[in-house]
């Protein structure tokens, strides 16, 4: 018997802020993802924050301090992506697809440690 998992192709889909800018657009993104799943692709989704959210968060950090701590800045601005990813995962589950949003520390993704400019040095993925 052939293990279908071994012959599945993987595709990485990246959706920018405008494409996830509203709930209706997120639903459309989920239809796109579902279309790849129907073609037996393993799908990895990367999403930006909804349009305008990152700018709003940046402005909030500036209103708190013109010298905002970079570690806290990174924690703050990443929340926009977390919201988008959770909404996408929730919608995918609603339409019957297995889905899970992940935060970088849950994998974990290891960086060189430079806040607001770090490069990924390692991704620890366990099958």
Segments from the language model and where they lie:
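Nucleotide/pyrophosphate-binding catalytic subdomain
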Residues: 2-127
């Amino acid at each position: 018997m052939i293990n279908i998992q071994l012959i599945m192709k993987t595709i990485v889909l990246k959706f920018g802020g405008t494409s996830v800018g509203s709930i209706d657009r997120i639903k459309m993104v989920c239809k796109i993802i579902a279309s790849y799943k129907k073609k037996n692709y393993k799908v990895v989704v990367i999403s930006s924050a909804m349009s305008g959210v990152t700018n709003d968060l940046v402005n909030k950090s500036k209103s708190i301090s013109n010298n905002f701590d970079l570690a806290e800045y990174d924690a703050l601005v990443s929340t926009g992506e977390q919201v988008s990813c959770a909404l996408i995962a929730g919608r995918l589950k609603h339409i019957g697809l297995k889905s899970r949003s992940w935060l970088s520390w849950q994998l974990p993704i290891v960086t060189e440690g430079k806040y607001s400019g770090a490069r990924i040095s390692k991704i620890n993925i366990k099958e």
